[in-house]
Amino acid sequence: NPLSYPYEVYKNDKDAAYDLIEDMCKNIYYDKSNDDPFWNNMASSFISGLVASLFTFGKEDEINFNSINALLSHDGKLLKNFVMAKFSSNSYVSTMTMPTISSTSDTRASILSVAREPFCPLVSRKRLSMLLSNSSFSYKDIVSKPTAIFFISKEDDVRVNSLISIFIRQLYM
């Protein structure tokens, strides 16, 4: 579960967790061939805010990509009301989500479309979704004990390669 390590960090150091969340989201939405990074950058910031809101109010077993995908199914008005009711205007969650939530309906729809795109293949495939919903290891154990890790994936599977990159980056942070 790519969110499990940032969530563990969040319990003791919110700022460090926000760095991990932002790094993960930038990795998910990075597209070197994109001439207009605005949409991916906005989607990345928005998802960073949703993840932080999930860390604040979600139960531990809800901290996963399936929950983020479920949050993305809500309309802008519901999300805006939730953020405004639960978070101060200068909170991390508000700072990251309000630019999208408060934008015009066409702009918001475009950002949400970009935000949803990478999650569809991750949550629509049952085995992958289950794999990404929990962690069977501790990052602390991996870095403190001799450990071998094997990744088996298709070379051209950009989404899975992105997840592998996120995993490796989290090990070094």
What function would you assign to each model-found segment?
Residues 1-173:
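P-loop NTPase motor domains
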